[in-house]
Amino acid sequence: MPKRTLQGVVVSDKQDKTVVVRVDRRFTHPIYKKTIRRSKNYHAHDENNEFKAGDTVWIVESKPLSKLKRWTVVQSEKEKTA
C-alpha cells in the first residue's frame, strides 16, 4: 500500500527536529450541501530544522518516530516548483 502524502502549512517550528503542519481539507456537508473547511495538525519530522513557520510543505507517512510523530517532511512548495 502506498504511503499517504499531504500538503500543508507549517504553523510551529519551535521543537527540535519537529514541525507542526496544518492540513486543510474541504468537503460537502451531506445534508446541507454546503462546502465546509476542516483542518488538522500533524507533527512531522524535520531532520535539519530547515522549515520555518509559514512554509508550505509536503509530508509523507512514516514509521512512528515518537509519541506524536508519524509523518516526515519531504519537500517545500518552493522546491517542488523550482
Swiss-Prot record:
Q: Does the keyword Ribosomal protein apply?
A: yes
- What Pfam families does this protein's entry cite? Ribosomal_S17
Q: Name one GO cellular component term.
A: cytosolic small ribosomal subunit
Q: Which UniProt keywords apply?
A: Ribonucleoprotein, Ribosomal protein, RNA-binding, rRNA-binding
Does this UniProt record's set of keywords contain rRNA-binding? yes
The record's annotation in Gene3D superfamilies points to:
Nucleic acid-binding proteins
Q: Which residues cross the membrane?
A: none
By its UniProt entry, which InterPro entries does this protein fall under? NA-bd_OB-fold (IPR012340), Ribosomal_uS17 (IPR000266), Ribosomal_uS17_bact/chlr (IPR019984), Ribosomal_uS17_CS (IPR019979)
| Position of the signal peptide | none
GO MF, one term, reads: rRNA binding
Q: Name one GO biological process term.
A: translation
Q: Listed disulfide bonds for this chain?
A: none
How it assembles, according to the record, is:
Part of the 30S ribosomal subunit.
Function, as annotated? One of the primary rRNA binding proteins, it binds specifically to the 5'-end of 16S ribosomal RNA.
Could you say which protein family the record assigns here?
Belongs to the universal ribosomal protein uS17 family.
Q: Which PANTHER family match?
A: 40S RIBOSOMAL PROTEIN S11 FAMILY MEMBER (PTHR10744), SMALL RIBOSOMAL SUBUNIT PROTEIN US17M (PTHR10744:SF1)
> Know the name of this protein?
Small ribosomal subunit protein uS17
Per the UniProt record, the source organism is Afipia carboxidovorans (strain ATCC 49405 / DSM 1227 / KCTC 32145 / OM5) (Oligotropha carboxidovorans)
Q: Which gene encodes it?
A: rpsQ
